[in-house]
Amino acid sequence: MATWIWILIVIVVGLACAAGGFYGARKYMENYLKDNPPINEDQLRAMMLQMGQKPSQRKLHQMMAAMQQNARKK
């Protein structure tokens, strides 16, 4: 076979692997987030009650904002 055919085959296989990897990782993350959803305000309120703190709406919003800001940094 000609060299250009081998190069074309390698490029096509590389693109197919990249697309398959992308969709596989995407499906994995969708399933992971479905099984382990991010924490919401109700869960945060329950956690604060278990720690013996009285959760005010202001404190809940502060903690949610801090967690979202911390998640963006990573």
From Swiss-Prot:
Task: Report the main location listed first in the record.
Answer: membrane
What membrane topology was assigned to this protein in its record? Single-pass membrane protein
Superkingdom, natural source = Bacteria
* GO CC, one annotated term: plasma membrane
Keywords associated with the record: Cell membrane, Membrane, Transmembrane, Transmembrane helix
**Where is this gene product found?**
Cell membrane
User: What residue ranges are annotated as transmembrane?
Assistant: 4-24
What is stated as this protein's family in its record? Answer: Belongs to the UPF0154 family.
Recorded protein name is: UPF0154 protein LVIS_1358
